[in-house]
């Protein structure tokens, strides 16, 4: 629920993911009286619509989502692909953003040919590669800072929910930004 006068915080997920990656962070900041908006980009999670093939297009969509949520200004947080989207929002709409946090980012964000081709074929190998490269050695051994959380299993389930073409679209957008 948006409360007028509170600081906004907008979360943008990474490739093939959805808003659920921000559940714990969203709760943390909501308890500190921030207005939380954790988006599902079009064709991700519970969001309808067509895939957006560019980071710039995703950034424009995020601004529309902020408008719909009543967030005139916001702290913006993005993970991986979402960090590029957040960066683009902050660069092109600086009057709307009070702070920027980029998690798991690189600029440029190159994507290997094997990964991109595997994603184009909707091969499970693409999801396996993303999951392998997304976690530390401790994570692969079951280590997690949150008791009872298996991050590799969680990301597996999340990527399995991605619709056809979603991961390829997202990776290609990162590679071309």
Regions found by a protein language model. Give the residues of each.
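Short beta-strand-to-loop junctions in surface cap/lid or active-site-entrance loops
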Residues: 1-7
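Active-site glycine-rich loops that stabilize anionic/oxyanionic intermediates
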Residues: 6, 14-17, 80
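Structural cue for short, hydrophobic secondary-structure segments
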Residues: 11-14, 38
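A generic "structured core" feature
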Residues: 12, 76-77, 85-88
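Alpha/beta-hydrolase active-site loop signature
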Residues: 16, 41-45, 107
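Active-site loop/oxyanion-hole signature of alpha/beta-hydrolase fold enzymes
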Residues: 23-81
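Flexible "cap/lid" loop of the alpha/beta hydrolase fold
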Residues: 84-132
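Conserved alpha/beta-hydrolase catalytic His-Asp/Glu region
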Residues: 117-177
């Amino acid at each position: 629920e948006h409360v007028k006068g509170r600081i906004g915080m907008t979360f943008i997920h990474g490739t093939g993911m959805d808003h659920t990656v921000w559940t714990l962070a969203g709760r943390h900041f909501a308890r500190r009286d921030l207005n939380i908006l954790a988006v599902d980009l079009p064709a991700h999670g519970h969001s309808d619509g067509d895939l957006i093939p560019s980071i710039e297009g995703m950034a424009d969509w995020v601004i529309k989502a902020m408008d719909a949520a009543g967030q005139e200004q916001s702290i913006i947080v993005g993970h991986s692909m979402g960090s590029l989207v957040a960066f683009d929002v902050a660069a092109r709409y600086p009057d709307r953003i009070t702070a920027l946090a980029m998690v798991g980012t690189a600029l440029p964000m190159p994507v290997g040919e094997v990964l991109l081709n595997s994603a184009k074929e909707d091969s499970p190998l693409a999801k396996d590669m993303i999951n392998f490269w997304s976690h530390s050695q401790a994570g692969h051994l079951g280590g997690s800072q949150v008791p009872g959380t298996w991050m590799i299993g969680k990301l597996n389930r999340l990527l399995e929910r991605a619709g056809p073409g979603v991961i390829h679209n997202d990776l290609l957008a990162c590679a071309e930004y």
